[in-house]
C-alpha cells in the first residue's frame, strides 16, 4: 500500500474531456447494437452494414446523435418535434386489416431510387407512411410500432458515447459472449461490489475475459492503488481494457506477473533469472493488445490476432519495409539499420517488462493484498487455493465461473482448508422490462443465465496452528464431557437391634 501511495494520481478532468478528440476510444451505438472504435481522421468504419468516416464527430460532445449521409459523412441530427396526440389519425381496431402485400404503393425500386438521390431516411419513412393505404386504419400502438420498425430499417442514426464498464460489458455480452466467458453485465457489477473494489486498494486479478474485468476494476479505482494481473501464456490479453481509453496515469499502478511463476513465489524459490526463461514475445503481445485498428476493422474480429508481430499493427511501417524490400537500390545499410533499431527497441521493451515483473513479484511477496478477483476459463479450485496466500486477513475474494459444479467443488475444498468465512455461492437473476405508456411488461426474451459467483472473506489461521495449548484444552474439554461421574454409594440407615 505504501508503494501505491507514492505514485501520482490521475489529473482532474477538464471541460474538454467531455468532447470527442482525435485518437479517443469511443463506442458507436445504433438502437441496441454497440461497437468500440478509435477516432481517426479519414478512417473508414463499417458498422451495421454501413460505412462512414468519423472526421465530423471530432469536437462534438459525447452522446451526440449523427446521421449517415451520402459519401459516408456524419452530420449531427437535428431534433424533430413529435406529432401531438390531437394531430394523429388512428383507428380503433386492427381486425379488418388484411396483410396482402398490396397496402404499400412504393416498390423496392422506388425506395432504392430515393436512396440514390440522397434523400434522408427520415423523409423515406414519411413517404412510406403517406403511401400506405392501411396506416390510418391501424391503432395508435400499431402505428408507433410501424414507424419504429421503418426507422430502424431506413434511418441510420449513430450515437457516439463514452466507453464505460456498463456499455462495454453489454457490447461484449451481446456480440461476443464467448470472449468474456458468458459473463453478464449484472454479474460483473456484483463482482465489483463483493470484491470491495475502491480507490487505494491493492488488488490481485486473474481473468481471461479479454481484459474486461481488469478495465472495470481500473475504472472503479480511478487510477489510485495498484492492480497485479496474473496471466497465462505469453502475455496478458487487454483488448477490452484498451477500449476504455484510460490515460497513462492509470497504467502506472498496473502490474503483470506470469501465472506459471506463482508456485515458485509461494515456495520462496523465485529469482530474477527465472524471468529470462520466459518467451520473448510477451512484450509484443502487450503492444498488439493495445492497438485496436486491426482487431476491429471487420465484424468478424478474431482474438488470435493479438499474437501478431508489431509491424502488422503499424500500416505505415509495414508499407515502408515492403518498399525497401522490393527496391534493390534501398537494400544494404538502411535495411540493416532498421533491423538494428527494431532489435534495440525490442530489447528495451523486454527489459522494461522484466522490471515490471520484478516489481509485481515484490508486491505479491508482501502477501497483504486487499482483495482477489478470479474470472477465468480454467478450473477455479487450484487457482484460488494458490492465490489466497497472497491476500491479507479480513479481505474479500470473488470467483466467477460460467458453471455451478466447479464452484461447488471449490466451496468444498475451501471448507476443508479453512482460513475463510462467509462463503456464499450465488447467481444473479435478470429480466428486462419494456416501459411505455399503457404497454409496460416484461420482455418476452431474457437471458438464461449470467454465470455463478463464489465469494467470501479471508481470516488468519496461523495462530490456531501454532498454539498447541488450544488443541490440548479442547481435547481436555472433550474428555470431561464424555466421562461419566462415578455412581455414589447409598448410605444404609442403621437399625436398632
Curated annotation (Swiss-Prot):
Q: Name one GO cellular component term.
A: nucleoplasm
Q: Note the superkingdom of the native organism.
A: Eukaryota
Tissue-level expression = Expressed in brain, liver, testis and ovary.
Regions of compositional bias (Basic and acidic residues) in chain numbering: 79-100, 327-354, 478-497
Q: Where in the cell is it found?
A: Nucleus
Residues with the Phosphothreonine modification:
107
Alphabetized, the UniProt keywords read:
Nucleus, Phosphoprotein, tRNA processing
| Family recorded in the similarity comment | Belongs to the TRM6/GCD10 family.
What job does this protein perform? Substrate-binding subunit of tRNA (adenine-N(1)-)-methyltransferase, which catalyzes the formation of N(1)-methyladenine at position 58 (m1A58) in initiator methionyl-tRNA. Together with the TRMT61A catalytic subunit, part of a mRNA N(1)-methyltransferase complex that mediates methylation of adenosine residues at the N(1) position of a small subset of mRNAs: N(1) methylation takes place in tRNA T-loop-like structures of mRNAs and is only present at low stoichiometries.
Which protein, by its recorded name, is this?
tRNA (adenine(58)-N(1))-methyltransferase non-catalytic subunit TRM6
Q: What is the lineage of its organism?
A: Eukaryota, Metazoa, Chordata, Craniata, Vertebrata
Gene that specifies this protein:
TRMT6
Amino acid at each position: 500500500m505504501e508503494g501505491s501511495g507514492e505514485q501520482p494520481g490521475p489529473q482532474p478532468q477538464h471541460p474538454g474531456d467531455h468532447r470527442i478528440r482525435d485518437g479517443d476510444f469511443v463506442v458507436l451505438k445504433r438502437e441496441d447494437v454497440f461497437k468500440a472504435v478509435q477516432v481517426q481522421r479519414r478512417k473508414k468504419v463499417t458498422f451495421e452494414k454501413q460505412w462512414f468516416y468519423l472526421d465530423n464527430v471530432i469536437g462534438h460532445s459525447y452522446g451526440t446523435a449523427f446521421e449517415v449521409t451520402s459519401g459516408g459523412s456524419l452530420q449531427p441530427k437535428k431534433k424533430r418535434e413529435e406529432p401531438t396526440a390531437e394531430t394523429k389519425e388512428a383507428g380503433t381496431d386492427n381486425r379488418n386489416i388484411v396483410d396482402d402485400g398490396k397496402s404499400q404503393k412504393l416498390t423496392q425500386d422506388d425506395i432504392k431510387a430515393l436512396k440514390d438521390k440522397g434523400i434522408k431516411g427520415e423523409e423515406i419513412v414519411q413517404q412510406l407512411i403517406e403511401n400506405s393505404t392501411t396506416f390510418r386504419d391501424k391503432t395508435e400502438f400499431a402505428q408507433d410500432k410501424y414507424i419504429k420498425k421503418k426507422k430502424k430499417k431506413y434511418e441510420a442514426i449513430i450515437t457516439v458515447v463514452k466507453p464505460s464498464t456498463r456499455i462495454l460489458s453489454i457490447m461484449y455480452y451481446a456480440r461476443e459472449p464467448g470472449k468474456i466467458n458468458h459473463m453478464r453485465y449484472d454479474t460483473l457489477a456484483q463482482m465489483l461490489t463483493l470484491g470491495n473494489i475502491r480507490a487505494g486498494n491493492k488488488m490481485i486479478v486473474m481473468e481471461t475475459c479479454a481484459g474486461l474485468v481488469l478495465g472495470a476494476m481500473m475504472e472503479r479505482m480511478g487510477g489510485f492503488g495498484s492492480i497485479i494481473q496474473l496471466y497465462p501464456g505469453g502475455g496478458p490479453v487487454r483488448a477490452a481494457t484498451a477500449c476504455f481509453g484510460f490515460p497513462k496515469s492509470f497504467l502506472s499502478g498496473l502490474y503483470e506477473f506470469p501465472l506459471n511463476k506463482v508456485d515458485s513465489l509461494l515456495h520462496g524459490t523465485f529469482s530474477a533469472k527465472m524471468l529470462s526463461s520466459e518467451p520473448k514475445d510477451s512484450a509484443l503481445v502487450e503492444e498488439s493488445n493495445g492497438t485496436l485498428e486491426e482487431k476491429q476493422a471487420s465484424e468478424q474480429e478474431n482474438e488470435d490476432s493479438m499474437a501478431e508481430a508489431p509491424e502488422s499493427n503499424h500500416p505505415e511501417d509495414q508499407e515502408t519495409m515492403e518498399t525497401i524490400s522490393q527496391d534493390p537500390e534501398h537494400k544494404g545499410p538502411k535495411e540493416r539499420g532498421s533491423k538494428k533499431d527494431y532489435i534495440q527497441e525490442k530489447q528495451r521493451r523486454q527489459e522494461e517488462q522484466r522490471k515490471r515483473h520484478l516489481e509485481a513479484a515484490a508486491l505479491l511477496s508482501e502477501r497483504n493484498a486487499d482483495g482477489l478477483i478470479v474470472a477465468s476459463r480454467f478450473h477455479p479450485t487450484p487457482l484460488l487455493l494458490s492465490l489466497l496466500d497472497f491476500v491479507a486477513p479480513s479481505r474479500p475474494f470473488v470467483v466467477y465461473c460460467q458453471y455451478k459444479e466447479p464452484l461447488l467443488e471449490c466451496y468444498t475444498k475451501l471448507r476443508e482448508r479453512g482460513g475463510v468465512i462467509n462463503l456464499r455461492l450465488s447467481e444473479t437473476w435478470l429480466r428486462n422490462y419494456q416501459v411505455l405508456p399503457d404497454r409496460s411488461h416484461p420482455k418476452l426474451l431474457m437471458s438464461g443465465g449470467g454465470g455463478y459467483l463464489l465469494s467470501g472473506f479471508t481470516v488468519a489461521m496461523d495462530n490456531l496452528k501454532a498454539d498447541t495449548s488450544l488443541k490440548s484444552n479442547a481435547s481436555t474439554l472433550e474428555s470431561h464431557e464424555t466421562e461419566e461421574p462415578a455412581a455414589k454409594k447409598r448410605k444404609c440407615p442403621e437399625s436398632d437391634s
